Amino acid sequence: MDIKYNELVNQFAPGAKQITIKKIRKKGNGIFSLNRYTSGTVLLEVPLENIICRKTVEQFRNSCDKFASIATLEEWNDMSFRTQAMLFLCYLWLGIQPRTNKWDKFLTVLPLSINTPAQWPEKEVYSLQGTSIFNPVCVKRKILQQEWLSLNQRYSDSWPSKITLPKWVHADALFHSRCLESPFKDPVLAPVIDLCNHSSKSNAKWSFSEDAMQLYLDKDIDENEEVTINYGSEKGSAEFLFSYGFLPEPEGDRITNVMKLLIPEDSNDSLDLAKRRSCKTPPMIEFVSDSSGELWWHAPFLFFSVLNVEDFTNFKMVCDESKAQTVDWEFEGQKCSVEDLPKLVQLSPKRDLYILRVFCLAEQLADAALNTNIENMYNPTERRSESVELLKRESFLLKKVLLYLRDVISKLLKSKVVVEFIHSQTIES
């Protein structure tokens, strides 16, 4: 094992089992076992004072006046942990702190580049057109640039003004690609454990004891076998590329495929904007095909969107605290959140009619996404291999989704409730 990794393990995970760090082609580095170990074995423990979390960054702030000088304690506590961690990493990179601080060995093993699209050259970002992450990547790049400009303007006479835009973008990529969930309010960065690569057939997991973060096996492993964790079985190809900079390997002929699309504003619905203000987050539609091949989708807002005023028991426009118009509503005599509305619709006597409307709208959104996908797939523009592969995976998913949606629509059109409604509309017209 390279001496710098040996020193890293000894400092941050003292007492670790027999492991080594090796380079892996196209994957950077990975952790390998030097012995056979059984499921349940704790391979290593990182004491909580050796992980990067709010508490340890706060301790660093308390010990370093220059680092702390940019914000009062109240201002610091108002920052997200992401911002705190990025400032912490950037401060260490600037070399202001003497190279004897405890985090130096962690800093030396961090990758100099990560293949996340936010760090791609602008021309290559455009190769993502037609995929579900093209717009999110463009928005993220813009937000990172705005954050960096704000830092430079606000701290023009202090150390943050020395942070370059590439360093700020890289700090964000490091945070999102290496952070791990914790029982605390925020995720954490864990030296050594963060060297574990992803596998859908992982053999290890992490957990927390009272005073340490542990990496333990949940399968038996052989000598020289790589130790892997699962970055998220519910995450699809787009999210992996967006957050980690790579596309996950298929599981045989199966792969978890997820597409998340922003539901566009409906210019034909005068109540659309008011309905959207009832949502805590921008309304999305999510299509999923899991590793077993099972297909499902999720879009609670569509159930709200397809309801007309006369479909509600009560529906009135009101002003929220910012004096923006929103809606106060009840469906079949009950108040509920947009997220819970689908459950009420399922119990309605007019269920089939409402579900038909929802499926028709979902079909329109999937069809529009597929058309955009196909247009870009055959665009002669030179594309990165990751972009081409993501286009193919999302095209396959959308075609599968459309077959399912259209099959359900054809069945719903034969429903007694739907047939009677169509007949009543024909008579009225």
UniProtKB/Swiss-Prot annotation:
Broad class of where this protein is predominantly found: cytoplasm
PANTHER family linked: SET DOMAIN-CONTAINING PROTEIN 8, UNCHARACTERIZED PUTATIVE METHYLTRANSFERASE
Species whose genome carries this gene: Schizosaccharomyces pombe (strain 972 / ATCC 24843)
Gene3D superfamilies, per the entry: set domain protein methyltransferase, domain 1 (3.90.1410.10)
SMART domains on file: SET (SM00317)
EC number: 2.1.1.-
Keyword Cytoplasm: yes
GO molecular function: protein-lysine N-methyltransferase activity
Protein name in the entry: SET domain-containing protein 8
Keywords from the UniProt entry: Cytoplasm, Methyltransferase, Nucleus, S-adenosyl-L-methionine, Transferase
Paired cysteines (S-S): none
The encoding gene: set8
InterPro entries per record: Rubisco-cyt_methylase_MET (IPR011219), SET_dom (IPR001214), SET_dom_sf (IPR046341), SETD3_SETD6_MTase (IPR050600)
Keyword Cytoplasm among UniProt keywords: yes
Localization in the cell: Cytoplasm; Nucleus
